[in-house]
Amino acid sequence: MRVKGIKKNYQHLWRWGGMMLLGILMICSATDKLWVTVYYGVPVWKEANTTLFCASDAKAYDTEIHNVWATHACVPTDPNPQELVMGNVTENFNMWKNDMVEQMHEDIISLWDQSLKPCVKLTPLCVTLNCHDFNATNATSNSGKMMEGGEMKNCSFNITTSIRDKMQKEYALFYKLDIVPIDNDKTNTRYRLISCNTSVITQACPKVTFEPIPIHYCAPAGFAILKCNNKKFNGTGPCTNVSTVQCTHGIRPVVSTQLLLNGSLAEEEVVIRSENFTNNVKTIIVQLNESVEINCTRPNNNTRKRITMGPGRVYYTTGQIIGDIRRAHCNLSRSKWENTLKQIVTKLRVQFKNKTIVFNRSSGGDPEIVMHSFNCGGEFFFCNTTQLFNSTWYRNTTGNITEGNSPITLPCRIKQIINMWQEVGKAMYAPPIRGQIKCSSNITGLLLTRDGGNNNETTDTEIFRPGGGNMRDNWRSELYKYKVVKIEPLGVAPTKAKRRVVQREKRAVGLGALFLGFLGAAGSTMGAASLTLTVQARLLLSGIVQQQNNLLMAIEAQQHMLELTVWGIKQLQARVLAVERYLKDQQLLGIWGCSGKLICTTAVPWNASWSNKSLSDIWDNMTWMEWEREIDNYTNLIYSLIEDSQIQQEKNEKELLELDKWASLWNWFNITNWLWYIKIFIMIVGGLIGLRIVFAVLSIVNRVRQGYSPLSFQTRLPGRRGPDRPEGIEEEGGERDRDRSSPLVDGFLALFWVDLRSLFLFSYHRLRDLLLIVTRIVELLGRRGWEVLKYWWNLLQYWSQELKNSAVSLLNATAIAVGERTDRAIEVVQRAFRAILHIPRRIRQGLERALQ
């Protein structure tokens, strides 16, 4: 028997040992499976082209004068602009392929066109002009240089009056640049306006000003503007010092050629930028590190007169010039300019292998290209820059720098008919400005072109000439350090977490389209950035809402206009675009079952073909931008798999939940499940112990009420009997005393039943007593409450009657008093009336007495 028992125990141990070994092998052979996890609010962006809107300082312009840039339609600038530096981020920039430049160019053209729409067309002036040289009537000698002969013409012409079928002869002064002689005229007295045969000339409205006002370009919600802060950035290639801003700096839309005015300066050295230095067709943009002040003036004291050209159309022209006809000119410091050229030459020699650098005048073309053209106080100046670009800088020399502080004086001419943006068919007439004109500007850059074809190794000289004419280069000189990116807040990455419970998630607070606040974590690793998703997402919806309010206020400010400006249209587009981005992201999150979540696990397994990097390599060493580039080709595939998985979960919710519990043996050893098991075990044991204690206490209380204390909670020993008292016989005869104990109870179930029965009886009696007490209390409170209510009701009736009686008495007394006073007043009136009636009688009686 002993041998059999040992054999049986050994077989039992062998069976359990085999099962444990099999389980250990299964656990050890199981590998960690990775699953796709969705992250919302990751610092990821992609290059994009979007509609930008403008911001401008509300105090930067005169409300009574309409500036051509329509900055009154822009949103107000942020008094505390935020610039967020992104550490450990390298981004590629390309100033030559920047959509911001194209957009600004189109905006400025549209603004000019729109500002001229309501203005007068000068088509009636396209007639024959009989002109002769103009001379001042009261000339006086002065130190200013006289205008060249024939620079201004006094022309007469026939024009329609306010009555259309009548003509009258008018006189006007024109600049020589604005008129051309008629071909068949040999006397040079017959002219026409220069653009009449090619363009429609529009006169600028009287209250339009061309003064450049800083314009800030801003990105709508869901987009951001990246800024390169490298001090020597050449405009193309990687930038290691990157920050994100909501708006650009204030860019003055200065329309000029050859020289860039009132722009931004380089922080350290002069910087030259070109799309391709070896290609002479490409313009070279020079950014100075120190500005050179240039002061321009038109000394002529002009007057302005009006000429009516039919009903509702007025043409403004120069009336008379008081004093000498002196030419306009600009002055700048010679030493500063030559020092600027010296720094430019140093940079050019680096690009062109230490060759001789020659600066020469423009090679020819339109006046806008040949001369430095710009707007000064409302007049368009065309200045000869030959003195600025007329020097040779030999190799290993400092050039022919002129000693002395004498200023450089540039002779300027004025042109009133401007070919707008070198476009065919559009010309503008700038009305003359009264009085003298002075303006001061800062030269902050140059536009240069290089002679020759491709870079020739055999030549030792490079010739550079002033260029311009393409206004895109003007805007490019300011926008070179910016680029627009589209925020991609949705990111996917592998984790060990899998979506376990398939249920409808509770909707959390909505998060809006991504704003720039979260980009501060762009340079952090994926693991570090994912820990701050909540902080990164706080400004998302608040940012879009605030921006929407600002845009709406700017749009409402334009309701008095018949049509929106270019900025108004852009603001509407920005509003719609921001809402679209927000709805698109929320739609994807809803389709994936991730609404309101920053981190959302899925049931889609991670495919190693997408990326075979380990979790530590991904989360500890890579940024979100690097990871996005890693899986960019598979993003759409992953999105579709997540969507398919969510659809399958919704179709088979119950079945998938049941199967998921038995997905792998490892779920049995999940720490969360074991903690739940331990919690249930502790609750059961604690409940049994507590129940046992309650039963013991109830038993003790019951026994104490019977007059003695038992030795045990359940086993009660019989009371001692006297020696003369028999214990009974086999037939259970004999006498039983009262103090004899009841039979003992054996077994757990019997003990449990006795205790449970005692508990229920005790609870029943106590609850019955409590119910009786509560019933008595409620009855007593009800009776007392009813008595109190009756007392208050009687009291209310009593005081109501008293108040009623008092009111009646007061009303009666008031009526009696009023009646008495009314009677007295009537009596007084009657007496007065009788007295008046008796006046004739008294007079008669008096006369009778007097006559007697």
Swiss-Prot record:
Family classification: Belongs to the HIV-1 env protein family.
Record's signal peptide: 1-32
Region (Immunosuppression): 570-588
Coiled-coil features, chain-numbered ranges: 629-663
Entry superkingdom: Viruses
InterPro entries: Gp120_core_sf (IPR036377), Gp160 (IPR037527), GP41-like (IPR000328), HIV1_Gp120 (IPR000777)
Pfam families: GP120, GP41
Alphabetized Gene3D superfamilies for the sequence: 1.10.287.210, Human immunodeficiency virus 1, Gp160, envelope glycoprotein, Single helix bin
Note on domains (UniProt): Some of the most genetically diverse regions of the viral genome are present in Env. They are called variable regions 1 through 5 (V1 through V5). Coreceptor usage of gp120 is determined mainly by the primary structure of the third variable region (V3) in the outer domain of gp120. The sequence of V3 determines which coreceptor, CCR5 and/or CXCR4 (corresponding to R5/macrophage, X4/T cell and R5X4/T cell and macrophage tropism), is used to trigger the fusion potential of the Env complex, and hence which cells the virus can infect. Binding to CCR5 involves a region adjacent in addition to V3. The membrane proximal external region (MPER) present in gp41 is a tryptophan-rich region recognized by the antibodies 2F5, Z13, and 4E10. MPER seems to play a role in fusion.
Stretch list, region Disordered: 715-741
Keyword Protease annotated: no
Name this polypeptide is given: Envelope glycoprotein gp160
CDD domains named among the record's database cross-references: HIV-1-like_HR1-HR2
Region of interest: Fusion peptide: 508-528
Extracellular side: 33-680
Region described as V1: 131-154
Region (V3): 296-329
Ranges for region V2: 155-196
Organism for this UniProt entry: Human immunodeficiency virus type 1 group M subtype B (isolate BRVA)
TM annotation in the entry: 681-701
V5, as annotated region: 454-467, 457-467
